[in-house]
Amino acid sequence: MSIADRAATSPAAGAADAGARGAASVPAAPAGAIALPLTGERELRLDLFRGLALWLIFIDHLPPSLITWFTIRNYGFSDATEIFIFISGYTAAFVYGRAMLERGLVVATARILRRAWQIYVAHVFLFTIFLAEITYVATSFENPLYTEEMGIMDFLKQPDVTIVQALLLRFRPANMDVLPLYIVLMLSLPLVLVLMRWKPDLTLALSVLLYAVTWEYDLYLSSYPNGFWAFNPLAWQLLFVFGAWCALGGARRMQKILSSPVTLAVCFAYLFFSFLVTLTWYVPQLGHLMPRRIEQWMYPIDKTDLDVLRFAHFLALAAITVYYLPRDWPPLKSPWLKPLILCGQHSLEIFCLGVFLAFAGHFILAEVGGGAALHALITLSGILIMCGMAWLISWYKHVADKSASRKGAGGNADMAGGG
C-alpha cells in the first residue's frame, strides 16, 4: 500500500495547523499548487507522478539506449529520485500529521516507526532476492563481471562481515540506495511533524540550515567497505521536509506566488538554461559555448548531496506542473493513466519489483545483445509486469477491505504510509 492510500479518504484536518484545516474555504487558483485534498477527494496527481518516477527509475537502471533518452535526467539537472522523495515527504506528512492531531504524538510516532520497519523489511528482502539473482546469473553464465558491476564482490569475499553491514544499511548493491534513504527520512518524521505543528516555516528554515551545514563541512554517512551513501540523508532531507511543509499548508500559501506570470517565466527560463547545459554533455561540439567561469562555478552538479541546481530544477518542474495540471485535470480519470496511478499507489512493492526486473533486463541485453528493438521490448515488458503487479495488489486490497467491512472491522491506519 502506498503512503498516499489513506490520504484518499482523509479529511482536510490532516494538516498540522489551523490554516490547513480551513483549506476548504480557500478559493483555488486556476490550476493551483498541490494542497491538502478536501474530504473524500484523492490527490491523484501525487499517485500519477510517483508512478511516473517509478517507471523512470526502472528505465534509468537499464543499460543506456534510445529508450533511456525519454527520461527527464537527459534534459535537465534533476531526475526521478527528486520526484519520489518529494512526494514521499508530502504524503507521509499528510497521513501521519493527521494521525498526530487526532491520536497524539505517541500513536503517530508508533505508526511511523511501524512503517519505517516495513520499509526496512522490504529492503532486506529485496537485498536477499537481488543478491541471489545476481549470484545465480554470474555463476550460471560463468561471468563474474556481473558481481563486480552490481557491487556485491565484497559480500562474496566476506559474507559474514558484509551481511551485518547490509543490515546496518551501510552495504548495498547497485540500484538499492533509495530505500535506505527513505528509511532514515521516515525515522526523522516524528521530529519534523512536531516542529511543523509548532512553527512550520522555522522547521523548513532549520532544514535549509542543515543542508547548508552539510555542504559547508562536508558531512556524510559512511558506507561499507569504503566511501559514503549515494544519497546523503543530511542533504536529501531538505526535499523530504519541503514536501512535508507543502502538505501541511505551505503549498496553499504559495498559490499566488506559483501562479504569478513572473514565477512561471523564471521557471521556464531556468528549465531552458538547464536543457542547454545538458545538451553540451551529449554534443561535444557545443562545449565551447559554455563560458569557463560558469563551468567552474557550476560543476560538478552533485547528486549525492542534492546540488542546489538539482533542487532548483525540481522546483521549476513542480511549479509548472501544478500550474498547468489542476487537481481536476480530466485525464486523471482516464483509463490510459490508470496504470501509472496504480503503480504510484503501491510504490514500495513496485520499486522493489523494478529493481529486480532492471537487472533481469540488463542480463538479457548483455547476453543476447540486440539493438533498440530488443531494448524497447524489455522496457515495455518490465513496465507491463509492474502495472500487472500494481493491479493485482490493488485488487487484493479491495477484496480484503470488502471482507473487513462485512465483519465490521476498520481499515488499518498503520498501513497508511505504505509504499
What are these regions (language model features)?
Residues 2-419:
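Alpha-helical transmembrane segments and their immediate juxtamembrane cytosolic regions
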